[in-house]
């Protein structure tokens, strides 16, 4: 057997034993352009046992066959280490993959480089999952066991603390940069809708988001009838109504975070808070949680049982980590909630109804779901036992892989020694790659030590101190987007105080004249025009405008509040009296001054009250009569002025009578509405009594 150095056209080189024109014996080979290095034993051009080093510093130590990793070996890839069997270049059949930084690992069976079959996942906080896997995801039956609540990892990213590498990892073993858990991401992690803890899916805080998303049952009083003012009230006396708005099993995170299902999301108002079950803040630090049942695509879906050591338990159907379907929830105080769930919200319960047949059907479906959940839990326990046996077998293969790695390192050392003897100037890049990797790890570790405690804990997935655990779900949960605009809407009122704006936000007489209200009325332009023309008006007209700005009578406030239900703004039923125009010298001036006042009042009047408007134009047409005779004596002028004054007084009385008639019409219109409401209510009560009588 001869040996020496051989340079290839692609930039690679080989230095070692040679026979029959192929590499044979021991030797060292570099890849194209000198990238990558293999050192070990050869068999007529194919690797047998040795060490392959990538430019990133990742290594494989083990056996090869036909140019692919095959047999036993150890792969070091970033912070992850795989020890076990290899089949034609892929991980499997049995092996262990673990993280050198967090301690998370998977032990079980593999297929095509992904977890497939049975295995055990151990998470960074110590929680475990034992069961079935398919294509790298939990799929089938399995058991998820958490650690005590005080020790559980606070998951601040949608990816799981242990398995983020299995489905969102680069080839060099680093977490994807778009992941919030990536240590290379700049700035603090974005707050998630909830602060979940590993393995805890049960929650006793109200879930406003799911309650708003779940449609409620419709009825006669919910279809917009009776002006939309009557709604079906929800009972607060039964267990179902008190607990239906409570989110027991909330998890709105991605599939990668399903093992760390979220607890309560946004909280709820104080309504019924004192009557609800114990809050999440009261959970004991030693409480644990277990889920046994079906998994689909890495999520709790199908039938399953989830229970806590404190006594909280749910048996029934699941969908995407949410209670969805029929099931039964048992609270720590012994109360039971049975019925149909939709997105964690109870939409149908088994309490006594008028239609007993319907409630019996719901109860039968609940019993069927509970039986299915119990069967699924029993199957999951059996699958967990099988996974435990596969785990022990994978551990044995991992120990054998360690021995194979030692043999591969020995072959690599022999090949390096031979290469130095044959060609002392031959460059061996493998040691340089490993040195770079060690320096990079040292730098990353030093940076992680210099990071603030809160950021380091969020990025590395380390558990938070137990003292913060009970209040994390309440204090660190961000407010909903709809609750923050209050600061933006309140400042305009103290900045522009108007005497015509009431505390209730209704328009007062000052606003009827065109003044802008605190809510941003559109009558800003007419009010400015009126203010510019006010100096040119006579004293009598200014006095009339000041009279309109007086505070309204207490008896007319209910009218404004009543018509606010029909319109998006407050409306006064009685139109404001226009200023007198008798003293105007010319009819053209009076017409031009009366025009700007109409746009300010038109948007604020009810549509039914436009009838009396033509009466306002009559004074402008009749005013020129006392002005035409200019050459007559003063006595005749006095007579005409007296006649004009009497006519003006009569017109004022006519306008007042028209306004009173309009008010009477509005009152008459109000009475049929109340009568109609009362009649419909009495009719419904009578029909209900008749229906119950027929059933009994």
Swiss-Prot record:
Where composition is biased (Low complexity), the residues are: 176-189, 251-280, 587-603
- Organism domain of life: Eukaryota
GO term, biological process aspect, one: regulation of release of sequestered calcium ion into cytosol by sarcoplasmic reticulum
Coiled-coil parts of chain: none
Q: How is it modified after translation?
A: Phosphorylation on Ser-165, probably by PKC, affects RYR1-mediated calcium ion release, interaction with TRPC3, and skeletal muscle myotubule development.
Q: Which residues are marked as site: Cleavage?
A: 155-156, 204-205, 572-573
Q: What is the effect of changing residue 169 to K?
A: Found in a patient with atrial fibrillation; likely pathogenic
Protein's UniProt name: Junctophilin-2
Q: Which gene encodes it?
A: JPH2
